[in-house]
Amino acid sequence: GDDAYGDIPVNLAQVMLGSTIRVRTPQGKKVNVRITAGTQPEAVLRLRGMGFADRGRQGDLYIRTHLRLPEPGDEELRGKLAELFRDMGMKF
């Protein structure tokens, strides 16, 4: 079979905490994709047998994650984020 490729947007909470996202396969079927906690931006997830069929074989579907960041928000929210990032040992 032939492999298929696609992209999905993920947010910070989804990649840090883990999540399930519904995606559409090339055949139009909707399937759940598990985003595990700690998934890195631009990670490529492989869905075996979800690509294009060719000569009796089924290809795989490869999905790349793209991190979408939220708007910075107000001063209070930025303060909470700064505290969280400091607690995580992040420098900024």
Report residues per predicted region.
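Intrinsically disordered, low-complexity linker/assembly segments
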Residues: 1-92
